[in-house]
C-alpha cells in the first residue's frame, strides 16, 4: 500500500493551543490492578480527574509494564490500553529480549505511588529517576513527564547537537526533529535523534535513560522557581517506552546501552584510511588529478569520493555523459583498484521526477510516497522536482537492490567500494506548504547549471590511462486502523503543541508530515525521525546484495538511535571555523561512545566557507584521531586538499604516519566495540570516572584506552593547557614520562604540524614498523610493541587481525599482551598468520640487558623478530 497526505482535524474535545503552565493543572493518573512478581510488574492507569485536554485529548486508560530485564537494565513502558497509539516499529528498532532478571538481583529498583501515579528508579537507595515532579500527561498529540534531578548534575547525550559534551542544566532545550541543518548551529535540532541521556555520579556510578520514541519532542533541563533541578519530556505522540541502564562507570553504561539498541557494525580495514572529497569537482579529470596530486605529494590517499557532481543533472543513479562518462569512470575506478585504493560516491534518497530509469522503475513498482488523491507526492531538491522512496513499502528493498546492482555493477557500471547517503532527514528545499514544486525548481535554478565540458585533463597525469592525458586533438491509500500505528483524527500537520524546530513548522523543508506510509500505514508525523535510518539499513542491504561477502561501508547524515548497527556518520555541513574544529570533538565523542555510532568524523578543514592554512593544518592532525577521516568542502570555496599548502601537507603526512602505524590498534579497539559495545573514542572522564575535574573536559579525549589526545584549541596558539589525571603518561614522540597529578600542564612550542599525544601508563600498543601509502601495503609491514608501564609497573594490550574485509572470517589472530615483573607474556588464538614483531620498546626508567638500546634514559628497545604463532614469554629486564 502507498502513502497518502491526510489533512486531519484535531480530535473532538481537544483544546486550542495552550501553554506549558496549563499542564500543571492536569489530574494525572491512578494506578490499580497492580500485579507483581520477581521479574515484572503490571498495572492499569486511569485518568485521576477531569481531562485537561491541553494539547489534544487525554487518554483515560493506560497500561504500565515494568520488566527487570537484566541485573543492569530496567524496562518501564506506559502505553494506551487499546494499543492503538503509535509505537516505534520493531523492524526499525528490534526489541531486546525481556531477559531473565529479577527484582531481588537487580541493581535498579522500581517503586511507585498509586495516586497521582508516579514512579522512581533507584540504585542502592540513590534516586536516579523520580517522575513525581509533575503529574503524568498522556494525550492524543502530547506526552509530558518530568523527573527530578540532583543539584548540579553531570548530564550527557540527547543528540544530535553541537553544544558542549556536558549538557547545560539551566534553561536548556534539546529538540528532536531531524532536519537539513546547514551550518550545524548550536542550541538547535540537527540531523539525528538519539533520545538517551547519561547521568554520571562519580563514585556511585553512571546510569542512562533511553526513551524509545521517534516523535517530535522537546526535552527541557532547567530549575524550578525554588531551585529544584529537573528534566522534562514533551513529545508530540507515541508512548513512554523507557529503558534504564546502569554501570559502575560510564564505559560500562555505554556497553549496557549497546545491548538495547544493538552493537555497531564492524568496518573493513581500508575504511580507516584517509578519504578525500569535495562538492564541486567539475569532471572525472579533476577527480583523477586530485588522486595524482596526493600521490605526488607523498600523502597516503586511501579512498577518493565524488559528490553529486558525477550525476546527470543531479539525478541519482545516473552519470553526466559529458563530464563523468561511464567509460572514463570505469577507467578511474580501475586505476584506483589497481593501486589498492577505493572509490565512493553519494546517493540521495529523492529521485528526479523526469524520464529516467530510476524514476520510471520506481513509478512502475509504485514505491514512492503518494498523496491522498493518489498523485505522486513531490518535493524539490538538487535535481529539481523529486519523488521520495517509501522505506515502509513492502517492495522498496527489491527496488533499491536492483538500482544498486545495476548502476554500481562491477562489470558494467561504477564499481564503488562504499556508499555515502545524504539529504535523508529527508531534505526538501521547497518551503511548506510546497504546493508547486515545479515552479519552485524553475525559479531557483534546480538543477544548477553544470560547468563547461572538457575533453581531456589540462595537464599530464603520469600512470593514468591515455584518455586522462591532455588531448591532441495510480492509486491512493486511506488510513487503516491498526494496533500501534497511531490514533485517528489527529492534526498531523499543525499539532497544538509546537516543538522548537529550528526550521519552523514540522513539514517545512522536509516531507509533509501528513503522508501515510505503505505497509502498516504509519504516518510521517510519527516516523519522520526514522527516515534516514531506514534509508541507511536499506542501503546497507543493497550494498551487501551487490557484494555479499564483504563488510559494506555506508556513511549517512541522518540517524536515529541504533543507527550504528548499519552505518557510520559524518557530522554534517560544518563551517571552516575554529569553533567548529573544537565542537567536532564533543559531537564525535557523543556519537562514538554514548550513541554507539563509532565510525564518525567531521569534514576536516570545514565544509562551508574558506578555510585557512593554519586551521587546516591543525584540523588535518585532529581529524587523524577520529575513526572516520575525510577532507571535504563545498563548491565555490577555495580548494583545501591537504597538498594545497606545504604546512598542511606536512601536518597531514605526520598525522597519517602516526595513524597508519596505529591502524591495527584502531582496528582491534573498533572490533572490540563491535563485539561488546566497549567504546573506542572516549571522553577523558570515561577512563577517570571519579576525577570530577574530567567530567566537563571536551577538548581532550582518549583514542582508545591508551592514547590521550590534546589538540591545540585555537588560532595563533602554540601551547595547550592539557589536563593530566593522577596517573603516569608518556610522550608519544619521545617516550618521556609525564606524572599527572590531577592538574593542567602547559605543553609549549607546539608546531603547526604537531599534535600532542601521550600514552597512558598500563598500556601495550601494537604498531606497524613504518607507515605506507595504502592500507594494503601497510598490512605487509612488521609489528613493534610499545610497553608503557603503569604506576604499578604492569601493562596490558591486545591485537586483533583478520583478512580485513570479509563479513565471515575463516581465521583470526586474537592476542593478549601482559607485562609484569620485567616479563612480556603473549597468549591468545593464533589462527591467522601475522607479520613478525621485530622489536619491543619499554618506556620509563629501567635496567636494560645486553640487547637493550637506550634513548635519553627514558626507553629501551629490544630487537625480537618474534613470530606471533604461539604463546611466548620475553624477559625484558
UniProtKB/Swiss-Prot annotation:
Compartments where located: Secreted
Question: What GO CC annotations are associated with the protein?
Answer: extracellular region
List all annotated glycosylation positions: 171, 293, 373, 508, 574, 610, 744
Q: Which UniProt keywords apply?
A: Carbohydrate metabolism, Cell wall biogenesis/degradation, Glycoprotein, Glycosidase, Hydrolase, Polysaccharide degradation, Secreted, Signal
> Which chain regions cross the lipid bilayer?
none
GO biological process, alphabetically ordered: cell wall organization; polysaccharide catabolic process
Record's compositionally biased regions (Pro residues): 447-463
- Which reaction equations make up its catalytic activity? Hydrolysis of terminal, non-reducing (1->4)-linked alpha-D-glucose residues with release of alpha-D-glucose; Hydrolysis of terminal, non-reducing beta-D-glucosyl residues with release of beta-D-glucose
EC class? hydrolase
Could you say which residues form the signal peptide? Answer: 1-14
> Which GO molecular-function terms appear in the entry?
alpha-1,4-glucosidase activity; beta-glucosidase activity; carbohydrate binding
- Annotated region described as Disordered, given as residue ranges: 432-476
Write down the EC number. 3.2.1.20, 3.2.1.21
InterPro entries named among the record's database cross-references: Gal_mutarotase_sf_dom (IPR011013), Glyco_hydro_31_AS (IPR030458), Glyco_hydro_31_C (IPR048395), Glyco_hydro_31_N_dom (IPR025887), Glyco_hydro_31_TIM (IPR000322), Glyco_hydro_b (IPR013780), Glycoside_hydrolase_SF (IPR017853)
Q: Which residues form the active site?
A: 422 (nucleophile), 425, 573 (proton donor)
Q: Give the highest taxon in the source lineage.
A: Eukaryota
Q: What is its main location?
A: secreted
User: SUPFAM superfamilies recorded for this chain?
Assistant: (Trans)glycosidases (SSF51445), Galactose mutarotase-like (SSF74650), Glycosyl hydrolase domain (SSF51011)
What is this protein's function per UniProt?
Glucosidase involved in the degradation of cellulosic biomass. Has both alpha- and beta-glucosidase activity.
Q: Which family does it belong to?
A: Belongs to the glycosyl hydrolase 31 family.
Protein name (record): Probable alpha/beta-glucosidase agdC
The species is Aspergillus oryzae (strain ATCC 42149 / RIB 40) (Yellow koji mold)
Gene designation: agdC
Amino acid at each position: 500500500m502507498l502513502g497518502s497526505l491526510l489533512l486531519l482535524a484535531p480530535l473532538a474535545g481537544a483544546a486550542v493551543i495552550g501553554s506549558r503552565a496549563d499542564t500543571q493543572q492536569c489530574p494525572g493518573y491512578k494506578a490499580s490492578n497492580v500485579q507483581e512478581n520477581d521479574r515484572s510488574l503490571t498495572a492499569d492507569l486511569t485518568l485521576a480527574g477531569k481531562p485537561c485536554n491541553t494539547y489534544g485529548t487525554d487518554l483515560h486508560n493506560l497500561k504500565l509494564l515494568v520488566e527487570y530485564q537484566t541485573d543492569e537494565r530496567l524496562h518501564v513502558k506506559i502505553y494506551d490500553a487499546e494499543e492503538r497509539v503509535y509505537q516505534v516499529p520493531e523492524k526499525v528498532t528490534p526489541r531486546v529480549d525481556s531477559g531473565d532478571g529479577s527484582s531481588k538481583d537487580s541493581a535498579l529498583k522500581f517503586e511507585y505511588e498509586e495516586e497521582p501515579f508516579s514512579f522512581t528508579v533507584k540504585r542502592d537507595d540513590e534516586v536516579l529517576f523520580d517522575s513525581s515532579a509533575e503529574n503524568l500527561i498522556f494525550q492524543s498529540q502530547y506526552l509530558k513527564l518530568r523527573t527530578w534531578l540532583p543539584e548540579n548534575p553531570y548530564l550527557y547525550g540527547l543528540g544530535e547537537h553541537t553544544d558542549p559534551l556536558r549538557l547545560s542544566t539551566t534553561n536548556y532545550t534539546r529538540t528532536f526533529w531531524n532536519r537539513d541543518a546547514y551550518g550545524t548551529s548550536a542550541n538547535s535540532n540537527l540531523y539525528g535523534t538519539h533520545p538517551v541521556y547519561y547521568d554520571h555520579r562519580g563514585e556511585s556510578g553512571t546510569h542512562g535513560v533511553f526513551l524509545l520514541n521517534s516523535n517530535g519532542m522537546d526535552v527541557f533541563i532547567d530549575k524550578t522557581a525554588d531551585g529544584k533541578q529537573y528534566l522534562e519530556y514533551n513529545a508530540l505522540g507515541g508512548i513512554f517506552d523507557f529503558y534504564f541502564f546502569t554501570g559502575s562507570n560510564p564505559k560500562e553504561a555505554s556497553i549496557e546501552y549497546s545491548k538495547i539498541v544493538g552493537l555497531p557494525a564492524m568496518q573493513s580495514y581500508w575504511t580507516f584510511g584517509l578519504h578525500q572529497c569535495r562538492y564541486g569537482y567539475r569532471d572525472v579529470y579533476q577527480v583523477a588529478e586530485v588522486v595524482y596530486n596526493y600521490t605526488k605529494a607523498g600523502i597516503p590517499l586511501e579512498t577518493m569520493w565524488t559528490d553529486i557532481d558525477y550525476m546527470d543533472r543531479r539525478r541519482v543513479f545516473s552519470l553526466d555523459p559529458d563530464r563523468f562518462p561511464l567509460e572514463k569512470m570505469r577507467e578511474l575506478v580501475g586505476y584506483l583498484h589497481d593501486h589498492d585504493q577505493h572509490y565512493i560516491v553519494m546517493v540521495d534518497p529523492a529521485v528526479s521526477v523526469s524520464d529516467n530509469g530510476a524514476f520510471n522503475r520506481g513509478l512502475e513498482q509504485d514505491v514512492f510516497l503518494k498523496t491522498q488523491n493518489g498523485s505522486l507526492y513531490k518535493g524539490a531538491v538538487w535535481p529539481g522536482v523529486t519523488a521520495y522512496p517509501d522505506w515502509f513499502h513492502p517492495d522498496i528493498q527489491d527496488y533499491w537492490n536492483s538500482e544498486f546492482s545495476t548502476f554500481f555493477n562491477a562489470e558494467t557500471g561504477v564499481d564503488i567500494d562504499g556508499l555515502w547517503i545524504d539529504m535523508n532527514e529527508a531534505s526538501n528545499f521547497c518551503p511548506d506548504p510546497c504546493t508547486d514544486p515545479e515552479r519552485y525548481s524553475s525559479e531557483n535554478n534546480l538543477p544548477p547549471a553544470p560547468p563547461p565540458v572538457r575533453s581531456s585533463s589540462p595537464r599530464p597525469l603520469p600512470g593514468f590511462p591515455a584518455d586522462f592525458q591532455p588531448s591532441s586533438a495510480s492509486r491512493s491509500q486511506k488510513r487503516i486502523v491498526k494496533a500501534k500505528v497511531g490514533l485517528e483524527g489527529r492534526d498531523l500537520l499543525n499539532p497544538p503543541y509546537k516543538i522548537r524546530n529550528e526550521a519552523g513548522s514540522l513539514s517545512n523543508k522536509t516531507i509533509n508530515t501528513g503522508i501515510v506510509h505503505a505497509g502498516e500505514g504509519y504516518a510521517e508525523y510519527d516516523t519522520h525521525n526514522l527516515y534516514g535510518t531506514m534509508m541507511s539499513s536499506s542501503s546497507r542491504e543493497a550494498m551487501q546484495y551487490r557484494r555479499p561477502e564483504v563488510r559494506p561501508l555506508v556513511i549517512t547524515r541522518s540517524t536515529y538511535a541504533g543507527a550504528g548497527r548499519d552505518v557510520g556518520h559524518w557530522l554534517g555541513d560544518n563551517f571552516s571555523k575554529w569553533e567548529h574544529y573544537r565542537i567536532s570533538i564533543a559531537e564525535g565523542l557523543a556519537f562514538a561512545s554514548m550513541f554507539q555510532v563509532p565510525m564518525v568524523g567531521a569534514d576536516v578543514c570545514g565544509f562551508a566557507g574558506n578555510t585557512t592554512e593554519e586551521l587546516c593544518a591543525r584540523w588535518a592532525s585532529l581529524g587523524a584521531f577520529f575513526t572516520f577521516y575525510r577532507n571535504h568542502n563545498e563548491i565555490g570555496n577555495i580548494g583545501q586538499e591537504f597538498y594545497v599548502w606545504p604546512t598542511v601537507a606536512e601536518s597531514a603526512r605526520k598525522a597519517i604516519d602516526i595513524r597508519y602505524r596505529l591502524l591495527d590498534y584502531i582496528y582491534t579497539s573498533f572490533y572490540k566495540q563491535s563485539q561488546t559495545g566497549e567504546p573506542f573514542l572516549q571522553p577523558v572522564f570515561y577512563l577517570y570516572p571519579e576525577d570530577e575535574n574530567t567530567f566537563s573536559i571536551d577538548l581532550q579525549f582518549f583514542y582508545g584506552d591508551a592514547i590521550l589526545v590534546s589538540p591545540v584549541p585555537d588560532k595563533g596558539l602554540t601551547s595547550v593547557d592539557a589536563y593530566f589525571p593522577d596517573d603516569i603518561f608518556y610522550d608519544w614522540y619521545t617516550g618521556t614520562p609525564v606524572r599527572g597529578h590531577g592538574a593542567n600542564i602547559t605543553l609549549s612550542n607546539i608546531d603547526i604540524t604537531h599534535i600532542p599525544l601521550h600514552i597512558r601508563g598500563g598500556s601495550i600498543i601494537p604498531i606497524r614498523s613504518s607507515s605506507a601509502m595504502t592500507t594494503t601495503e601497510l598490512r605487509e609491514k612488521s609489528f613493534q610493541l610499545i610497553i608503557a608501564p603503569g604506576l604499578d609497573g604492569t601493562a596490558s594490550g591486545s591485537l586483533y587481525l583478520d583478512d580485513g574485509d570479509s563479513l565471515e572470517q575463516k581465521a583470526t589472530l586474537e592476542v593478549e599482551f601482559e607485562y609484569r615483573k620485567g616479563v612480556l607474556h603473549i597468549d591468545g588464538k593464533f589462527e591467522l598468520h601475522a607479520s613478525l614483531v621485530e622489536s619491543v620498546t619499554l618506556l620509563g626508567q629501567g635496567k636494560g640487558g645486553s640487547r637493550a638500546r637506550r634513548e635519553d634514559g627514558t626507553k629501551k628497545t629490544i630487537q625480537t623478530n618474534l613470530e606471533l604463532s604461539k604463546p611466548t614469554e620475553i624477559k625484558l629486564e
